[in-house]
Design a protein with these regions (language model features):
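A short, charged, Gly/Pro-tolerant segment at domain boundaries
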Residues: 138-156
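Glycine-rich phosphate-binding loops that contact phosphosugars or nucleotide phosphates
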Residues: 2-123, 127-136
Length: 156
């Protein structure tokens, strides 16, 4: 149960997967889970060296074949960190993740692929966030407090 032993959540995307990871960071932050989105491969590698076996990394890749991300995740795993991967099945990244959430959108058109893939990935992130919120009642209270406190920021 990675969400129960987690002390920090690091999201590691590259390129077109970055907005998806930023959305995930926002969702988990609102659930009172310390999270960061690290989209630079060099910083991913350096961050990997500061993680421990209580941390969780979510690797996000729409190809699953990016060498820099695969190398960062190999380093992360060498420190005993649990890695959850969101990527297509049967890719180098899917083969090294502890938990693979394979997302195969089955499309070839370059014009529609980014949109369809992004929607599929964001739906999975939403499901994960709801699942975590259900496991952590205190997260639900925190989310309610955040939403309520934002009312003062709105124009009347």
């Amino acid at each position: 149960r990675p969400w129960q032993m987690q002390s920090e959540l690091s999201l590691m995307p590259l390129a077109v997967s970055v907005p998806i990871a930023m959305d995930a960071q926002h969702k988990f932050f609102r659930l009172k889970i310390p999270s960061s989105c690290i989209s630079d491969p060099h910083i991913q590698f350096m961050s990997a060296n500061s993680l421990n076996d209580r941390d969780v990394v979510v690797a996000i890749s729409q190809s699953g074949n990016t060498a820099a991300l695969v190398e960062s995740i190999k380093t992360v795993k060498s420190f005993g960190v649990i890695v959850i991967g969101l990527m297509p099945s049967n890719t180098p990244l899917s083969r090294i993740c502890d938990i693979s959430l394979d997302i195969d959108v089955g499309e070839n058109a370059r014009l529609t692929r980014p949109l369809t893939s992004r929607l599929a990935y964001m739906a999975i992130i939403d499901v994960l966030a709801v699942g975590v919120a259900q496991l952590k009642p205190e997260a639900q209270d925190h989310l309610f407090n955040i939403v309520t406190s934002q009312n003062s920021l709105k124009l009347k």
